[in-house]
């Protein structure tokens, strides 16, 4: 079976990549999409190439992606597989000054090199534990 460490969320975090129905608070994925989401490995990352996805009252009626209902679904399934992080490209390191996401892929897994814009430039590495 296919398992993933890094999943690029399709269509800018639109509910239509999960289901035909947005859902009031959270999108319920179709069975095969749910199966794919449940094949995430522990410490996996989900990445939404999209604008920020705020959890505000008006976000729930938004027609164009990104959709907060889809974000909630992705985050729920990431938690179910003990995933590490849900990232939105235009929110990192902050929504005012987003920067590219950089991942390192090694035989030990995938790690996100977190960029911080506080004080002097620095890199904080988030590495999954290596088994064995």
Model-derived regions, located:
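Metal-dependent phosphodiesterase/nuclease catalytic metal-binding core
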Residues: 1-42
């Amino acid at each position: 079976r296919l398992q993933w460490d890094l999943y690029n969320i399709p269509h800018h975090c639109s509910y239509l990549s999960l289901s035909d129905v947005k859902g009031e608070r959270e999108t319920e994925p179709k069975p095969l999409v749910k199966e794919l989401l449940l094949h995430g490995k522990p410490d996996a990352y989900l990445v939404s190439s999209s604008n920020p996805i705020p959890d505000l009252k008006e976000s729930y009626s938004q027609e164009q992606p990104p959709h907060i209902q889809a974000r909630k679904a992705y985050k729920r399934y990431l938690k179910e597989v003990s995933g590490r992080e849900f990232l939105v490209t235009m929110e990192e390191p902050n929504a005012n000054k987003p920067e590219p996401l950089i991942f390192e892929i090694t035989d030990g897994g995938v790690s996100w090199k977190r960029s911080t814009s506080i004080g002097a430039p620095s890199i904080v590495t988030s590495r999954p534990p290596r088994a064995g």
